[in-house]
Amino acid sequence: ITLKKGKRTTSVDYTINTRREGSRERQGFNSSDMIYLIMSDRFVDGDPSNNSTKDTKEKADKNNIHGRFGGDIQGIINSLDHISQLGATAIWPTPLLGDNEAQWSYHGYACSDYYHIDPRFGSNELYCQMVEKAHEKGIKIIMDMVPNHCGSTHWWMADLPYKDWINQFDNFTNTHNCFSANYDINASEYDRLLSNRGWFDRPMPDMNLENKDLLKYFQQWAIWWVEYANIDGMRVDTYPYIEKVPASEWLAAIRAEYPNFNIVGECWTRPAPAVAYWQSGADNFDGFDSNLPTVMDFPVEEAIRQALETDGKNWGGGLTKVYDAVTMDYLYADVNKLFTFLGNHDMARFADIVKDKDPRRVKIGNVLLATMRGIPQLFYGDEYAMTAPEDPNSHSHLRMPLPLGDQVTKEQQEMYDFQSALFQWRKKEPVLHTGRTMHFLSRDNTYGFFRYNDNEAVFVFANAAEEARTIPTANYKEITSKYNTVGVNPLTGETIDLSKTDIKVPALSTLIVKLTK
């Protein structure tokens, strides 16, 4: 390719590779998967030799809680057996691309190079090896994409291709973090523009996807990574902060290339109607379609956390919150494409927020996560019920390295074994992947529901009360009458007869029963 500007001529060699065979038909992640979220720099240090490099500003310093610790791609590769044995079938690592900020670069969300892996994580070639090795174990890879903003150290910041390549102001102008302005019929134009054009943070210039060449750049960038690295999905950071029309066009281009691909967007808001607005296929009042197949289920995340952080005795508290959240399912275009979770890298660890840090409450949360509709995601370390005792609300403190070997306590191993059995079982149950849901009004801090299809059903009864509860089996006849009421607890092998009226579930525990015809 020859580039000319005035009397200057520059030639660049550009390789056009053959597309992977069958690439268009690639299958993305879906509700049969369990996603394992990794904070890349903090997870596992598999190659200490790359912790600091001459070309990157911030060096590794494990004594600095806000600094880099050395986690890397090799650490993920070394942990594939741990992840597979847990029952996870997909991995979402936080951004692995270059982030050359002088401080806080460990999080990776201030990109300095969209086409190269940060050398402290590895290389493009090693990333491809990770994908290949993961695929050999039946594990998909989801790439964390950040088109909303770049980093202040990105090379183009020294010489912007266009003045409007980024959204610029006379003085630093922060977004107000209230993206409801995008669908609020009463919103001012001032608030709407500030939502989309304000910077997420000082070292994160806001990209202007209304510039058609930038939009094309990001479309080609995303498609290139799919083809080059053979990835299985994308997670889009801060999706509603992008101008919504070009954001939809960006996703439309990707989905046109890969109709069966899946992309999940971070739409961090709690009201279900607001989350539903951003899912592709939503019947929106303004006709807008995001082209985003999957959205994160923040309403259910909040409901489960609130249900288990207290004793649930207050009016409308406890598991009633989960029941209420699920009643909003009618709002969504596709509930099987809701990304469900108990926590992530931006919120206090689940084991820290449940009442008394009780592992029994942690298990209740995990059973709900494994059996409710949607695509479950587990934050690394939660398989051990990891906590951040120094400061549970500090992002840096909750993102500590995964315990390895002798660092794993007896209690942590017991929790891992429980979750491994749970998610390995889920992996083999299509009724949990695509079955319908029938639930019953939450009473006395309990919640009973069925996932079912024409041939089988899974019954789940969660008791978050501090005393035993009797299952109101007589209330469930409208669905149990369609199956053999004698079923099996898949985690214990115990036979359970749901026609009986005296089945008690101990305090702070769950019961699962698989029914067939």
Specify the residue positions occupied by each region the protein language model found:
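Carbohydrate-interacting/catalytic domains
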Residues: 1-35, 77, 81-87, 373, ...
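Substrate-binding/active-site clefts of carbohydrate-active enzymes
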Residues: 33, 41-229, 247-257, 273-275, ...
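Hydrophobic faces of well-ordered beta-strands that scaffold small-molecule active sites
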Residues: 34-36, 91-93, 141-143, 234, ...
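Active-site rim elements
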Residues: 66, 208, 235-238, 350-359, ...
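Soluble or luminal CAZymes and related metallo-dependent hydrolases
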Residues: 68-75, 122-126, 213-218, 242, ...
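Active-site-proximal helices and loops of the catalytic beta/alpha 8
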Residues: 131-135, 149, 154, 221-223, ...
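Active-site clefts of carbohydrate-active enzymes
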Residues: 335-355
